[in-house]
A protein has these predicted regions:
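A cross-family glycoside hydrolase active-site/sugar-binding cleft signature
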Residues: 9-13, 38-40, 74-78, 142-144, ...
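Active-site-adjacent "subsite" loops/lids of carbohydrate-active enzymes
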Residues: 81-133, 151-210
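Conserved small/polar residues in nucleotide/adenosyl-binding loops
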Residues: 240-247
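The substrate-binding groove and active-site-proximal loops of carbohydrate-active enzymes
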Residues: 8-17, 43-57, 103-120, 147-149, ...
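N-terminal carbohydrate-binding accessory modules
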Residues: 1-36
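Short, well-ordered coil/turn segments that N-cap beta-strands
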Residues: 4-6, 33-35, 67-73, 134-139, ...
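Aromatic-lined substrate-binding rim segments of carbohydrate-active enzymes
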Residues: 26, 39-96, 225, 229-231
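Conserved, mostly hydrophobic/aromatic
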Residues: 10, 29, 66, 141, ...
Length: 252
């Protein structure tokens, strides 16, 4: 999609508002010289209040009003703040970190390698895309929000790390030499006996795990992009990520 103007706008959440002023707000946004809003990325629990029950009332209010006031819209996938029902049904979705297991409440508390999380995230992304794909005001999509690896050290992440190491070091003896694991009897001679990474005293191995965690973010973005691309036209796909230089790749 080609733009003949600089995009300048705000994030807007009709679903947060305690009173109805969407018409007033959108007119003020337009009168202030803005031309775009970002929506939808923060309220999975609004779009899916119960498992399999979807309510996109606020979404369509924003899209219809944006059309009326000639505002462009960037739609965000709502995967960085999980609903309470999801955490209750699948407690393993809450990330395990070096500091222990996350509790539900704040955002960005989930394990992006957990298969139950990925399954339900795909469902809400696809449902959201089905709702917005035919609106002319939609000009692009944001994947997740401020994405990080969240220091995930779950059994899923650690299993992926071992597979990553196997691929990087087909010879396990080379792996031990490369990381100096004879020190303090840290040597690993069987991949199936690879210890919990949270206990490592080897800073090189710890750094390799952090590098791997950044790869998890890249893979997560690519996975979401593949879902969104099934629904988008020639709309761009973007993301908000303060460490983008560490994980960026061509997602579009």
């Amino acid at each position: 999609m080609n733009f003949n103007e600089i995009l300048y706008g705000v994030a807007y959440y009709d679903e947060y508002m305690p009173y109805d002023r969407i018409e007033t707000d959108f007119k003020m946004i337009r009168d202030a010289g803005m031309n775009v809003i970002r929506i939808a990325e923060s309220t999975w629990s609004t779009w899916e209040p119960k498992e399999g029950v979807f309510d996109f009332t606020h979404l369509h209010r924003m899209l219809d009003c944006a059309t009326k006031y000639e505002l462009k819209v960037i739609v965000g996938t709502p995967t960085y703040a999980i609903p309470s029902w999801l955490a209750k049904k699948y407690p393993d979705i809450l990330a395990v970190t070096h500091n222990g297991k996350e509790l539900y409440g704040h955002r960005q508390n989930m394990d992006i390698t957990n298969p139950d999380y990925l399954h339900h995230a795909q469902i809400i992304i696809e449902k959201l895309m089905e709702q917005v794909k035919d609106y002319d005001c939609v000009i692009g999509f944001q994947l997740d929000n401020e994405t990080k690896p969240y220091d995930t050290c779950s059994k899923y992440a650690q299993a992926k790390f071992v597979e990553y190491l196997k691929n990087e070091f087909p010879d396990i003896d080379e792996f031990n030499r490369e990381f100096g694991l004879d020190y303090w009897s840290n040597r690993v001679d069987d991949w199936d006996a690879f210890p919990d990474i949270r206990g490592t005293i080897n800073m090189s191995l710890d750094a390799e795990y952090k590098k791997f965690q950044r790869k998890l973010v890249t893979d997560f973005f690519a996975w979401q992009a593949d879902i969104v691309k099934k629904y988008k036209r020639d709309d761009p796909v973007s993301y908000t990520h303060l460490r983008a230089h560490e994980t960026s790749q061509d997602l579009v």
